[in-house]
A protein has these predicted regions:
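Short, charged/polar connector segments at secondary-structure boundaries
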Residues: 1-79
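Amphipathic, charge-rich alpha-helical segments that serve as recognition/docking helices
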Residues: 18-27, 63-145
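Charged/polar low-complexity intrinsically disordered segments, enriched in acidic residues
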Residues: 156-224
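Hydrophobic beta-strand residues in large extracellular and virion-surface proteins
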Residues: 46-48, 136, 209, 216
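A general nucleic-acid interaction/assembly signal
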Residues: 127, 133, 137-177
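Short coil/turn helix-boundary motifs
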Residues: 40, 118-119, 201
Length: 224
């Protein structure tokens, strides 16, 4: 059963955020919720930890309420009791997987990695995101790599070629910053743009093309 609280009292603890993009909310999702609230819509209650008001599920809803109604905003919450942070984190993953903004593959890989770090049993982590244990292990192996310091990091679709590797600093930078598009797509896009004379050849762009040419030559020299 939900109760009413001041939205400003709720705590966004990013350690409990089950997605890979910590400190970052989806601006499109928040904007959609703001518009819904402005026309009188009522969003589902936010799930919080009863002990300290940390948000388990509802970061975007809380942000939208504060944006629309200010620091005096009221919000409906469901307060739950958790024995420990790992239990709270698993519930956050379960709730985020079952409704609202979908958790992408990189989000799920991040969630599994953090569950492993928190010593959450495989079966518990798998059930939270709607997978069986074997499927989860195979998915995790295809969607993670390890840094030189030993940290396991999730990979987007664009970084899947690095799965299972110990990453160099350059590879780690790519893995952390790449999005869901595979690199081959960008190659095709650039070729098409160049053929269509659609690239604005600023000094910076020309400099980057020269840099690209050098990288391509290194690759071609290696396959001759």
């Amino acid at each position: 059963m939900s109760t009413k609280m001041k939205a400003i009292e709720l705590v966004m603890d990013w350690n409990m955020w089950p997605r890979q993009s910590a400190q970052t909310l989806d601006s499109t999702n928040v904007a959609r919720m703001r518009e819904f609230l402005r026309v009188g819509g009522i969003l589902p209650p936010v799930v919080i930890n009863a002990k300290d008001y940390r948000i388990v599920d509802g970061f975007h809803r809380t942000r939208a309420h504060l944006d629309v109604f200010g620091d005096d905003a009221d919000i409906q919450v469901i307060a739950k009791n958790y024995a420990k942070d790992s239990e709270m984190f698993v519930d956050a993953g379960r709730l985020n997987s079952s409704h609202g903004l979908p958790m992408g593959p990189k989000d799920r890989a991040h969630f599994i990695a953090k569950c492993r770090k928190m010593k959450v049993p495989y079966i518990v982590a798998a059930e939270a995101i709607g997978m069986n244990v074997d499927s989860m292990k195979k998915f995790f192996a295809k969607r993670t790599a390890r840094t030189e310091s030993g940290e396991v990091i999730p990979l987007s679709a664009g970084g899947r070629g690095l799965a299972g590797k110990v990453l160099t600093p350059a590879q780690e930078h790519f893995a952390r910053t790449s999005n869901g598009a595979v690199p081959e797509m960008y190659i095709s896009m650039l070729i098409n743009a160049l053929r269509a004379d659609a690239v604005q050849l600023s000094d910076r762009t020309i400099s980057r093309l020269i840099e690209l040419d050098k990288e391509i030559q290194v690759i071609l020299d290696g396959v001759e």
